[in-house]
Amino acid sequence: MRLNRETIKDRAAWEKIGVRPPYFDLDEVEKNTKEQPKWVHFGGGNIFRGFVAAVLQNLLEEGKEDTGINVIELFDYEVIDKVYKPYDNLSIAVTIKPDGDFEKRIIASVMEALKGDPSHPDWERAKEIFRNPSLQLASLTITEKGYNIEDQAGNLFPQVMEDMKNGPVSPQTSMGKVAALLYERFKAGRLPIALLSLDNFSRNGEKLYSSVKRISEEWVKSGLVEKDFIDYLEKDVAFPWSMIDKIVPGPSEFIKEHLEKLGIEGMEIFVTSKRTHIAPFVNMEWAQYLVIEDSFPNGRPKLEGADRNVFLTDRETVEKAERMKVTTCLNPLHTALAIFGCLLGYKKIADEMKDPLLKKLVEGVGEEGIKVVVDPGIINPREFLNEVINIRLPNPYLPDTPQRIATDTSQKMPIRFGETIKAYHERPDLDPRNLKYIPLVIAGWCRYLMGIDDEGREMQLSPDPLLENLRSYVSKIKFGDPESTDDHLKPILSSQQLFRVNLYEVGLGEKIEELFKKMITGPRAVRKTLEEVVGREDG
């Protein structure tokens, strides 16, 4: 059986093999979407098909919405040719449940898939959709890189400069294309719309607004568009913030074989020339959270409660949910596992969770954070943390590696650990000196920077913009000689850039130095130190 609009009419055949077909009138919804489009989505990748498109499908099946989604792919046009067109815009979402069971469902809420290429006929159709008064929102999952218009040194990328010079006629960058389509909407009568970033980074709506506005301001300066276009962006276009949390790895061979055994044909995994790994199916974890700022000037779908843990709220709550995740309940645990996973030779996060010492370490990091957690009110931080420790991190079907998560650790330290230490320092009822697990992670990171694993062998370090600088301090320390530590860690541990506070001034610097010294006495000293600190029940 192949996946297409014809075969899904036989719902019983799909139900028989354990795949839930769509339960709404596709022809009717397609007709409505063509005439009165409400929702455009930029970036037709895995998290969109597995999570975002599924949220709308729920509403279609409940009769709460009557139009689907128009996808516009801005970056990798092969995705449209390989996994949208041949399968009539359908895909199979495979959710890996906590008990290891697979929940399978055909996602059919995408009614049109276009190439966001100004030299392709699809671009005219994209412009036509943006001129339609019915359009309520354009959401995006284009990865954080897609919003960047300048490099780390603050220089504009050459393609962005081209877009600024050429105006909205034939843009090449994602942000240039979004600005050009908004200009179409402006010319059609200043029609309102919300641009909703669903990419996983803080203050995502703010970043989207600033990139689109910067390009548009250059167009105004050069006389390529009317001055009022900026006024339109400020007054009639909303850029709501969001917090999204769901792990959707690349397509898995194991899931492909599982679907083929059920008799489903054509489940190939494609790697495009732009290195996108994509298939007609999506595999993902069960846990999910989506918190959206409720700012939609032209109305919106009935998103609240449209799926598990989907919330519409104010901007402050979105930011609190994001901070809860990145400072306490998920990201610090990830980094702790990344550091010790690299030192102890692990290749999978899920395998680390089988190590009682490492499981106890992340439980301890979570407990220390939860005392000062930012509580968003809509998500219970304790329940979120328990789900991360007991369900998400141990999931063997999510092939995440400590080496990948260890990338850019210097950029993550301030928010993932510094915020908690700072909060302990500022609270009269708490004392940073009583922290036990977070100092151990920081000592472990200093030990990691030596580039020697716990067996005493050289190990490759993950990319990090400050790596050279940090290595220059620890390179003077000799493995096997704790006394050679001397004052070499001081520039790292006193850095407010890294930890939000000077760790010596809050009573943690010396404690971390002592833990570090224990970890460099020789081979297997890291595990021994973990046993000593994590194995103890006292504070």
From Swiss-Prot:
For the ligand (NAD(+)), the binding residues are: W39, V40, H41, F42, G43, G44, G45, N46, I47, F48, R49, G50
Query: Any keyword Oxidoreductase?
Result: yes
Q: Which InterPro entries match?
A: 6-PGluconate_DH-like_C_sf, 6PGD_dom2, Mannitol_DH/Oxidoreductase, Mannitol_DH_C, Mannitol_DH_N, NAD(P)-bd_dom_sf
Q: What molecular functions are annotated in GO for this chain?
A: fructuronate reductase activity; oxidoreductase activity, acting on the CH-OH group of donors, NAD or NADP as acceptor
* Pathway given in the UniProt record: Carbohydrate metabolism
Q: Which reaction does it catalyse?
A: D-mannonate + NAD(+) = keto-D-fructuronate + NADH + H(+)
Keywords, sorted A to Z:
NAD, Oxidoreductase
Disulfide cysteine pairs (residue numbers): none
EC nos: 1.1.1.57
State which residue ranges cross the membrane: none
Task: Tell me which PANTHER family the record gives.
Answer: MANNITOL DEHYDROGENASE 2-RELATED, MANNITOL DEHYDROGENASE DSF1-RELATED
Q: Which family does it belong to?
A: Belongs to the mannitol dehydrogenase family. UxuB subfamily.
Protein name from the UniProt record:
D-mannonate oxidoreductase
- Species of provenance: Thermotoga maritima (strain ATCC 43589 / DSM 3109 / JCM 10099 / NBRC 100826 / MSB8)
Give the organism's phylogenetic lineage.
Bacteria, Thermotogati, Thermotogota, Thermotogae, Thermotogales
